[in-house]
């Protein structure tokens, strides 16, 4: 019998993934990662629901204490990024360093199981010519999460199942109801998991980063107002600047050395190119010559045409056909060719 470890968060997606595989005849083991430190986090609603689902399905349930791994790879990663004026993307980092990698290691070393599954909306293919596993967009483009999975390795893709990749969210809820799952009507999480535990991103950052007042200036250096810490701002931000001006102003740069927030008009917040580091080439080998494809520089943005220029050392330059608004250092630039995710990396300052 095929054995698989399913990551269970206690939500409808992971619950349905586990139930679907169990229904298909897989020998399923549920695994929940204990991520948050602090009072009450050991018995969070998600962990309780995950345990209930496993009991309902009649499958084993393991809880792995990942709090130190989460703090090092996500909390520290976020704080250090915001301190130097970038806006980190924790979800892709979490998927590789906290979830998929450690989950597969636990499955292999502790349970003797060589396959894992999650409730992510994405698909995995295999190219016979290149001999590489490919990461593909989900059928439900509105729920597609491949953008956050660009950092997965070939080993992880070879060992992973995405049972929900070929269905819509509505179908997932319908299937959950058919299985009688407690989580069938559970609302979706609207924020990062760590933000839900702290109230808001601002509250979270203020807990770790000391507020330091500085100037809000225009592109010529004229002081327009004051801020209480550059970690409260991100490139392209318009709301909450607290600066009066005859035309809308946007954050165009964060200067951690001078502790300044630099603002300008919308055109000033546009870029024709950017550098990307820590590239992980997923579905194709690392190219040695320029290629033309599409790039997505924010989760909810549309892919746009780019020229990709390899720089070596896992770095590339993206040259856009048209200037792009609000390209944000620390966020991911992910390359696609149709539904195929070619690779991705982190936008540099």
From Swiss-Prot:
Protein EC: 2.8.1.13
Q: Which residues of the sequence carry a binding annotation for ATP?
A: 7-14, 33, 119
| Disulfide pairings | 94-193
Enzyme class label: transferase
GO biological process, alphabetically ordered: tRNA wobble position uridine thiolation
Record keywords? ATP-binding, Cytoplasm, Disulfide bond, Nucleotide-binding, RNA-binding, Transferase, tRNA processing, tRNA-binding
InterPro entries associated with the record: MnmA-like, MnmA-like_C, MnmA-like_central, MnmA-like_central_sf, Rossmann-like_a/b/a_fold
Q: Which residues cross the membrane?
A: none
Q: Does the keyword Nucleotide-binding apply?
A: yes
* Annotated Gene Ontology cellular component terms: cytoplasm
Q: Which residues does this entry assign to the site Interaction with tRNA?
A: 120, 331
Molecular function as annotated in GO:
ATP binding; tRNA binding; tRNA-uridine 2-sulfurtransferase activity
Reactions catalysed, as given in the entry = S-sulfanyl-L-cysteinyl-[protein] + uridine(34) in tRNA + AH2 + ATP = 2-thiouridine(34) in tRNA + L-cysteinyl-[protein] + A + AMP + diphosphate + H(+)
Which residues lie within the region annotated Interaction with tRNA?
143-145, 298-299
Q: Where in the cell is it found?
A: Cytoplasm
> Where in the sequence is the active site?
94, 193
Q: What does this protein do?
A: Catalyzes the 2-thiolation of uridine at the wobble position (U34) of tRNA, leading to the formation of s(2)U34.
Which HAMAP family did the record assign?
tRNA_thiouridyl_MnmA
| Sequence similarity | Belongs to the MnmA/TRMU family.
* Name this polypeptide is given: tRNA-specific 2-thiouridylase MnmA
| Designated gene of the protein | mnmA
């Amino acid at each position: 019998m095929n054995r698989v470890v399913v990551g269970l968060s206690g939500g409808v997606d992971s619950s349905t993934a586990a139930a679907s595989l169990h229904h298909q005849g897989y020998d399923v083991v549920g695994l929940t990662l204990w991520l948050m430190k602090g009072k009450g986090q050991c018995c969070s609603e998600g962990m309780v629901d995950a345990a209930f689902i496993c009991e309902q399905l009649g499958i084993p349930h393991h809880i792995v204490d990942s709090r130190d791994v989460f703090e090092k790879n996500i909390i520290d990663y976020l704080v250090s990024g915001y301190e130097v004026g970038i806006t980190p993307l924790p979800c892709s980092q979490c998927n590789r360093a906290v979830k998929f990698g450690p989950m597969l290691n636990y499955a292999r070393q502790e349970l003797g199981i060589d396959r894992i599954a999650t409730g992510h909306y994405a698909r995995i293919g295999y190219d016979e010519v290149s001999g590489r596993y490919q990461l593909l967009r989900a059928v439900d483009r509105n729920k597609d999460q491949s953008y956050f999975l660009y950092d997965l390795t070939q080993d992880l893709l070879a060992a992973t199942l995405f049972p929900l990749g070929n269905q819509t969210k509505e179908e997932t809820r319908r299937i959950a109801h058919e299985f009688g799952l407690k989580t069938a009507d559970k609302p979706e999480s609207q924020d990062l998991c760590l933000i839900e535990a702290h109230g808001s991103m601002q509250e979270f950052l203020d807990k770790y980063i000391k507020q330091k007042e500085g100037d809000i200036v225009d592109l010529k250096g004229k002081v327009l107002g004051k801020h209480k810490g550059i970690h409260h701002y991100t490139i392209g931000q318009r709301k909450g600047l607290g600066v009066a001006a005859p035309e809308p102003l946007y954050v165009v740069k964060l200067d951690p050395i001078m502790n300044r927030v630099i603002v300008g008009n919308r055109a000033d917040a546009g870029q024709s190119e950017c550098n990307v580091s820590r590239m992980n080439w997923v579905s194709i080998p690392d190219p040695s010559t320029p290629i033309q494809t599409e790039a997505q520089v924010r989760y909810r943005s549309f892919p746009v045409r780019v020229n990709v220029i390899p720089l070596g050392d896992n770095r590339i330059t993206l040259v856009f056909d048209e200037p792009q608004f609000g390209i944000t250092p620390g966020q991911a630039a992910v390359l696609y060719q149709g539904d195929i995710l070619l690779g991705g990396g982190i936008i540099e300052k």
